[in-house]
């Protein structure tokens, strides 16, 4: 090989190495508040909110708000409509191919079906007690609800709107994720473990302890690298191998975690907590994560959704009144949301 060829080869190798390092580095610039949208009071005046679902195809946010689902334009913050007359909304799952959405109504022990175009309720499906997390699993083409009161999962055929199975979970199920190939991973909040389900057979395949994390609530997955991200109410984030159940790394986080979001394009992992902290981590390698920054948000801002196009985060919260004096029935009273202060916060770079 000629000297000139060697020099050209060396330059190419150097360029590739630099490019590789750039891909492995977290994006520059900190996350901060960009916009704030007021969303108004919940019907009946009692404030409660839970999961947010973002539909990238329509640029819509479906936001649980006590007895209704608010539908919001993700770009303008305008309220496009609502799905009212529910009991206590937790989550919203969308099945665009059928033109239907499914709401977990924990107060009614049912999944409520609605039309994605008209937002009109079209059906009610009985589930286990207090359905919380709800999601569409693509391999089986079924809807799953995780039922916190009856300690089981309800499996629904969204095409026929019928229950096809009920799966005992062995504890109180919280948030779950699917790998797209048939496996589901669910937090068992009161047992400090992850349950692995096979959606093709509707059977439990494994129970994995999550120590030193505990009180598992938030769950997310890096599907490509087979990593689970488990947020615990004992203020520990655990990173787990989705094939072996081994806990690979842990990080301290704020109090009251409820949502984890992983962004494959940037390798960023976001964790939102009730105390008003947004923790941001970076996947340096599948076996090594690092802290990027911790952003101060607002108290109660623990539920969020990600827009993968703009890389912006949508987080909801409201104002809170001080907790009442302790009583025998309520030895540890919590701050209570103030009616009419519900709002959507938009964070980005």
Language-model regions, residue ranges each:
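Bacterial N-terminal signal peptides
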Residues: 10-20
């Amino acid at each position: 090989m000629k000297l000139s060829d060697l020099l050209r080869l060396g330059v190419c190798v150097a360029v590739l190495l630099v490019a590789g390092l750039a891909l492995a580095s977290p994006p520059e610039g900190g996350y901060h508040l960009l916009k704030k949208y007021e969303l108004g009071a919940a019907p009946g005046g009692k404030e409660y909110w839970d999961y947010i679902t973002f539909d990238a195809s329509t640029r819509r946010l479906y936001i649980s708000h006590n007895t209704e689902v608010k539908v919001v334009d993700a770009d303008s913050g305008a309220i496009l409509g609502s799905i009212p007359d529910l009991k206590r909304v937790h989550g919203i799952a969308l099945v665009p191919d059928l033109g239907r959405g499914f709401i977990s109504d924990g107060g009614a022990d049912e999944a409520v079906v609605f039309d994605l175009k008209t937002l009109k309720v079209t059906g009610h499906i009985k589930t286990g007690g207090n359905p919380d997390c709800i999601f569409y699993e693509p391999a089986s083409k079924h809807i799953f609800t995780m039922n916190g009161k009856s300690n089981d999962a309800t499996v629904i055929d969204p095409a026929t709107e019928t229950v096809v199975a009920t799966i005992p979970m062995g504890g109180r199920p919280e948030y779950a994720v699917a790998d797209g190939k048939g496996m589901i991973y669910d937090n068992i909040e009161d047992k400090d473990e992850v349950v692995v389900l096979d959606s093709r057979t509707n059977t439990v395949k494994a129970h994995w302890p999550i120590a030193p994390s505990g009180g598992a609530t938030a769950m997310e997955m890096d599907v490509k690298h087979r990593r689970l991200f488990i947020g615990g109410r004992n203020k520990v984030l655990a990173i787990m191998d989705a094939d072996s159940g081994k806990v690979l790394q842990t990080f301290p986080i704020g109090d009251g975690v409820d949502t984890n979001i992983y962004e494959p394009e940037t390798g960023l992992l976001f964790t939102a907590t009730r105390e008003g902290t947004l923790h941001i981590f970076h996947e340096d390698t599948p076996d090594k994560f690092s802290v990027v920054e911790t952003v101060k948000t607002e108290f109660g801002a623990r539920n969020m959704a990600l827009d993968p196009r703009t890389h912006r985060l949508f987080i909801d919260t409201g104002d809170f009144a001080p907790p009442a004096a302790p009583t025998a029935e309520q030895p540890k009273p919590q701050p209570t949301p103030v009616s009419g202060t519900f709002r959507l916060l938009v964070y980005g770079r």
